[in-house]
Design a protein with these regions (language model features):
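Hydrophobic alpha/beta core scaffold segments
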Residues: 567-571
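N-terminal localization/anchoring segments of enzymes in phospholipid and broader phosphate metabolism
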Residues: 1-542, 560, 564, 576-702
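Glycine/threonine-rich ATP-lid/beta-loop region of ATP-binding domains
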Residues: 552-559
């Protein structure tokens, strides 16, 4: 670990602030806890274990990668809430990770044990019979060995490049002449299966990398294998995507260059399946440019994605009771799918709640707009899209039908860059006007504007969402989508697109809150309004549902509101840098985190008591990157019926004591018991969506 060169005076951090990275690790621990939760169906617990690992991989690539880069700076960089240096944060992260990995190993062993009564086992070679060993050896010789490339490190054959998150077998070899050499064998391969079934034992499997590790002597017959282990590295992914706007190249070509650069960045973590001697670990660290503190030993398979293969086996053997009950998002009862949608939306606002309601209603609207003679243009911001996106298909159809189609495709959506590059080409080829993001600001808003020419002039249908235009994630994440024909909202949405087309951002807005210029300041103003209400002897109320809270300016304003006596209730899924319930600071703030079947992703802002409530749905969390470094849009919900629905949803989430955990004054999360029967907000939302759809269907049939 490179030590920072220059010391700075340590500053005392506010007692109500928590470090962002450590708060995120607490969130990922709650994901891991679901893997160990006996109340979750057994096969689904495997999914949570895999999600925990995937989350941690990305965290190391992005967040630890950023901190490691900061440590290269000559000046000490301190985090602005707890004043921890980059080095202090990395040290704390490494220790917290080791604790979590021990917990993961215990949960993994528990899961494997619980699977055995259902006929599923994952074994090592030493648990095979002699007959089974011969069968597996034949399988190795015929199906795996021909596709392996062994590398013995030497002057003629330098240490090979190791791909991010791929699995390798590493061995210390002793030649007949007594010389020690290192061998590296790639184990990640799409040619052979990773999950190998044992033919004599139904439901019993072995991982291909374990088979490769066992049969290394067959590959190095002239050597004695002194030590061996499986290895996986996680590479830094902290690239500066802003540089694409400085290039003379096409933006897409510049981004493709950066993606290639990212693949070769230094590792930030190395995982080993077995302990090796200090000399060999030192050698590997030197070759891979990994600090020894970043080496982790694990008893758990290095890549947990194999669990999806186990789930497939369980499905095929009719073990449905080990899974969540299958759920199909319902079509919203607010729209009659058998009639044209545009006239219905012109009469009333519609709010879709995913995954309880189906994104198909919005896709149907786009398809209708693509063919409707009154529609002159469709403008849309795209961030993360599904494979084979029906939304892109609708935009292509619209362009081919002669509509003006303007699409901002954010090329810098991390790890979706290549997909977005391909979609931008498809849209351009169809005749759409494509904007590749905005210099200085990522465009993260979920905004769609359909403009129509009518006898009374131009009319608008505007859709504002909290989540991506992605059919896959709309069935997995909780999100909200407002569709409205409100003229003023439409005009302001048009101003957002006009600014984007000029490479600018909106400087002023009235109904919409539009970052980076007019979201944070408007939120602060509304918090101040609640403070003023309390000072006048009235009640003040703030309700916030977001994924993360890191914006120091907003945090300090919320603390000020709490100190003034404003009641503040928040549902914050992930990072929460504000510690609630601290006397004298945050005693009027309550924070709940929900980690359940679906990923909580919707954002709701509520300001004011019932009779004067303002309520918004938004694409923005209260993170500095969202409030001042991105283009984000929050839209007011003006329809009273929809406001009541959002109020009910918010209150239901606050009262969730099955999946909702309370953030305490210690900075830790605690179980709650609020109801005679445990309340699961996601289950209630699905039951309500199902009931409403059934009632409406019956009513229409009558």
């Amino acid at each position: 670990m490179k030590k920072q060169q220059k010391k700075t005076k340590e500053i005392t951090a506010p007692v109500y602030m928590m470090n962002r990275e450590l708060s995120w690790l607490k969130f990922n621990e709650r994901v891991l806890n679901e893997a160990g939760n006996p109340g979750v169906p057994l096969a689904e617990r495997l999914t949570f274990a895999a999600i925990y690992q995937s989350n941690l991989d990305e965290f190391y690539r992005v967040r630890v990668g950023t901190l490691m880069d900061q440590m290269e700076a000559s000046e000490v960089i301190r985090e602005n809430k707890t004043n921890m240096t980059s080095e202090e944060q990395v040290t704390a992260i490494l220790q917290a990770t080791r604790d979590l990995e021990q917990k993961k190993a215990a949960i993994y062993e528990q899961l494997m044990g619980e699977l055995e009564p259902y006929g599923v086992r994952l074994i090592n070679f030493n648990r095979l019979s002699a007959e089974e060993g011969k069968l597996l050896e034949t399988y190795f010789d015929q199906e795996i060995a021909p596709y392996l490339s062994a590398n013995i490190v030497s002057k003629q054959q330098p240490f090979p490049f190791l791909k991010n998150k791929n699995i390798y077998a590493v061995a210390s070899l002793m030649s007949k002449g007594g010389k020690t050499k290192t061998a590296i064998i790639p184990c990640s391969n799409t040619v052979f299966r990773r999950l190998i079934d044992i033919p004599t034992r139904k439901g019993t499997f072995m991982l291909s990398e374990e088979l490769i590790l066992h049969f290394l002597p067959k590959m190095f017959k002239n050597y004695e294998i002194r030590e061996k282990a499986l290895l996986r590295i996680t590479r830094n992914a902290d690239i500066d995507t802003e540089t694409i706007y400085d290039e003379d190249l096409d933006y897409r070509d510049a981004m493709e260059k950066l993606i290639k650069q990212r693949r070769r960045m230094n590792p930030v973590r190395m995982e080993l399946s077995r302990d090796l001697n200090k000399k060999m670990i030192s050698s590997l660290c030197k070759e891979l440019h990994v600090d020894k503190e970043h080496v982790f030993l694990t008893r758990v398979p290095l890549d947990m994605s194999f669990v999806f293969g186990l789930q497939g086996y369980l499905r095929n053997t009719a073990q449905d009771k080990l899974f969540y009950q299958r759920r199909t998002p319902r079509m919203t009862p607010e729209l009659d799918g058998k009639s044209a949608l545009i006239p219905q939306i012109m009469k009333k606002d519609v709010l879709l709640s995913y995954p309880f309601e189906n994104i198909k209603s919005f896709i149907n609207l786009l398809n209708e707009a693509a063919k409707d003679d009154s529609v002159v243009s469709i403008k849309m911001t795209l961030y993360r899209l599904a494979d084979k996106s029906q939304i892109v298909d609708a935009l292509v159809d619209a362009a081919e039908n002669g509509k003006e189609v303007v699409v901002l495709v954010e090329l810098r959506a991390r790890f979706d860059e290549e997909s977005n590059i391909e979609y931008s080409r498809k849209l351009e080829e169809a005749g759409c006007r494509v904007i590749y993001g905005l210099n200085g600001y990522k465009v993260h808003s979920k905004l769609c504007l359909i403009s129509r020419k009518t006898d009374k002039g131009v009319s608008y249908i505007t859709q504002i969402g909290t989540g991506n235009y992605n059919e896959k994630t709309s069935a997995l994440y909780t999100d909200l989508s407002l569709i409205t024909a409100n003229r003023e909202i439409g005009k302001e949405a048009a101003e957002v697109f006009a600014a984007l087309l000029k490479g600018e951002v909106v400087e002023k807005s009235n109904l919409l809150l539009v970052a980076p210029k007019c979201l944070q300041n408007r939120v602060l103003d509304m918090i101040q309004e609640e403070i003023d209400q309390v000072k006048q002897g009235k009640e003040g109320y703030i309700g916030i549902k977001i994924n993360s809270l890191t914006d120091k300016v907003i945090i300090n304003k919320l603390v000020e509101a709490s100190q003034a006596g404003v009641k503040i209730e928040m549902v914050v899924r992930g990072i929460c840098c504000l510690i609630p319930e601290i006397k004298g600071y945050t005693e009027n703030i309550k924070v709940v985190s929900i980690v359940g079947r679906y990923l909580e992703h919707s954002r709701i802002y509520r300001f004011g008591t019932k009779e004067r409530e303002k309520i918004y749905i938004a694409s923005a969390d209260f993170m500095t990157r969202n409030t001042v470094r991105r283009v984000e849009v929050a839209a007011p919900v003006l329809n009273e019926k929809l406001k009541e629905r959002l109020d009910w949803m918010f209150e239901t989430m606050l009262n969730d004591d099955e999946k909702g955990k309370r953030l305490t004054e210690t900075g830790n999360y605690a179980d709650r018991s609020l109801n005679d029967v445990k309340l699961n907000s996601q289950e209630i939302f699905y039951a309500m969506a199902y009931s409403n759809a059934e009632k409406t269907q019956k009513k229409r049939e009558d």
